């Protein structure tokens, strides 16, 4: 009988701890910039690896990036071809624009900055995926053109962030000026780059750029559908390598 009491008390303690942890996580989410900008429910974000990865990365940046900044999530930037490309996170800083491609993977990642495809390695499984540096170069190019049409010619930095589920990140970055890191080091890496940059935007200009990009986060359904199909086609091609 005493053993059963101990087991029940232990189970109750674990459930109580889990409830308190979840309540704390939900409170933190409600106060986050990600929730304020996207309006997404915590449960939806929690159940979607891509959204959860973007949220975890944005938390690090929100807490630790120095200087004035705005965040825009999931903007659909028009392409010259007539389609669009979706950015994960754009940070509008008083010193420039940081275009952040977020990957929420586990296991190992191997690659080279100048190779078209990289490897994602899990126990007993390997797959190839499109080089996120190349992917983000496209985002930067289209974003530069969009802002240029509004008279803004700003320094832009490409940032590739893997969430901390990646235990080993073995990528040779020779020849690339992009920032590549895990999410827990993203803020320190970006702050280091910011120290070498000069202020280019005042508060009013930052708000105007924010407004331009925020307007791109509410596309028609067929824009989202076209972007999803292009991503699926790219992943299918990578799977054949």
Which stretches of residues belong to each language-model region?
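Catalytic metal-binding acidic patch
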Residues: 86-92
């Amino acid at each position: 009988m005493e053993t059963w009491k101990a087991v029940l008390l232990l189970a109750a303690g674990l459930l109580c701890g889990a409830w308190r942890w979840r309540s704390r996580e939900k409170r933190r989410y409600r106060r986050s910039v990600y929730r304020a900008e996207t309006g997404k429910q915590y449960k939806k974000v929690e159940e979607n690896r891509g959204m959860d990865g973007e949220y975890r990365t944005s938390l690090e940046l929100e807490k630790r990036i120095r200087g004035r900044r705005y965040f825009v999530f999931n903007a659909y930037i028009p392409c010259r071809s007539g389609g669009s490309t979706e950015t994960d996170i754009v940070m509008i800083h008083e010193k420039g624009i940081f275009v952040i491609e977020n990957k929420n993977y586990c296991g190992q990642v191997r690659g080279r900055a100048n190779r078209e495809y990289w490897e994602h390695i899990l126990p007993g499984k390997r797959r190839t995926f499109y080089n996120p540096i190349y992917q983000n170069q496209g985002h930067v190019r289209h974003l530069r053109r969009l802002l240029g049409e509004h008279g803004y010619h700003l320094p832009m930095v490409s940032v590739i962030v893997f969430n901390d589920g990646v235990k080993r990140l073995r990528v040779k970055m020779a020849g690339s000026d992009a920032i590549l890191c895990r999410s827990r080091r993203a803020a320190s890496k970006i702050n280091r780059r910011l120290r070498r940059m000069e202020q280019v935007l005042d508060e009013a200009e930052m708000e105007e750029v924010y407004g331009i990009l925020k307007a791109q986060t509410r596309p028609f359904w067929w824009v989202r559908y076209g972007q999803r199909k292009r991503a699926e086609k790219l992943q299918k091609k990578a799977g054949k390598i």
